[in-house]
Design a protein with these regions (language model features):
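Beta-strand-loop-alpha-helix segment that lines the small-molecule cofactor/substrate pocket
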Residues: 1-27, 41
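Alpha/beta-hydrolase
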Residues: 19-27, 38, 49-51, 61-62
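Contiguous beta-strand/loop segments that form the cofactor/metal-binding neighborhood of enzyme cores
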Residues: 32-33, 45, 50-54, 59-214
């Protein structure tokens, strides 16, 4: 959650511990080549970027296997739920931002094998497609074009395929705008299709599709 990020930062400042957080694909040579191509003006002005992360498998949709024999005696549910103070901060944040419909308070405190093994499916513990997959695509674009923080971002989507009680969307579309750079980026994802459209940079003179390999 957002409050937790500030808590982590505060602990790092107070303790002086070394903390490293990264994205997937930082070692990818093709991003450096794509940056070079755009920097040399081969595409002309780039006004539209499209990225996606489609998946089409239970594991890709976070429906992980439940280990046989798992029960309240073999799982520390209180540890999984976390510190009461952290839970209170989370609840306060969700309430103040009028996100109560995503909390599911009755279910959160009830022992659940699905929630323990498939925690990514609930806002209570996860950031869903945006924080799990979109973040890597955004970082890739930022490596290539140094877009920084957008002027605005809007999202839409829902739970349209996996009707398993999850609260995070299995379909998501997000639009980022940089008016000062005359640039828009579109992100879309579905967990019910394996059609991968790659990363497409659309310029006035040419377009370029970027994969993870040269």
């Amino acid at each position: 959650t957002v409050p937790e990020t500030y808590m982590v930062r505060q602990v790092i400042k107070e303790t002086g511990v070394v903390f490293q957080l990264g994205h997937q694909g930082r070692q990818t040579d093709c991003y450096q080549k794509a940056e070079e191509i755009i920097g040399n003006g081969l595409l002309g002005p780039v006004n539209l970027i499209e990225v996606c992360t489609n998946r089409n498998s239970p594991n890709g949709a976070w429906v992980y296997d439940i280990i046989e024999g798992s029960n309240p005696n073999t799982i520390d549910w209180k540890q999984f739920e976390g510190d009461p103070e952290r839970i209170k901060e989370y609840m306060d944040y969700m309430t103040s931002n009028k996100l109560e419909r995503y909390i599911g308070p009755d279910e959160r405190s009830k022992f659940s094998l699905e929630r323990f093994f498939r925690w990514r499916c609930w806002w209570d513990y996860s950031t869903g497609l945006s924080g799990d997959l979109l973040t890597h695509e955004y970082d890739a674009v930022n490596q290539i074009m140094h877009v920084g923080i957008p002027h605005s971002a809007t999202s839409s989507g829902g739970v349209y395929f996996f009707k398993d009680g999850r609260t995070v969307p299995d379909v998501l579309q997000t639009t980022f705008e940089w008016p000062d750079r005359d640039l828009t980026m579109l992100y879309s994802a579905t967990l019910a299709s394996s059609r991968n459209r790659g990363k497409v940079f659309m310029g006035h003179d040419a377009s370029m599709e970027v994969s993870n390999i040269l």
